[in-house]
Amino acid sequence: MWQGKSVSVILPTYNEKESIRASLESFETLGIVDELIVVNNNAAPGTSDEVARTSAREVEETRQGYGFAIRRGLDEARGDYLIIAEPDGTFLARDALKLLAYADDFDVVYGSRTARIDGRAHV
């Protein structure tokens, strides 16, 4: 919950078996996320086992492709605020706070996980 509004995090997954659990656990400990949705887009074997060890809800999207996975996650999400994050370690859960800080003032807030300032990723 962020300022009285629910927060859903959507994580499309394909080859993130090794990082998915740590990513989900970091969102769980953040304390503001009401719903974690993992969109299994033909993910590597064992990914579902890692997801099952968390509070996340896993949904399957059989049509291959990032766009299909994102759309499926958006359809499934029930939060007032929706965050799309990559579960490969390039998006840190704490960066969601930086995005949500602007949510009251704008209809859409974007962050880049690839922007580099001082050699490090910043949102």
Residue ranges, per PLM feature:
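Cell-envelope/extracellular polymer assembly enzymes that use nucleotide-activated donors
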Residues: 6-8, 35
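Short, well-formed alpha-helical segments that are part of the catalytic scaffolds
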Residues: 15-29
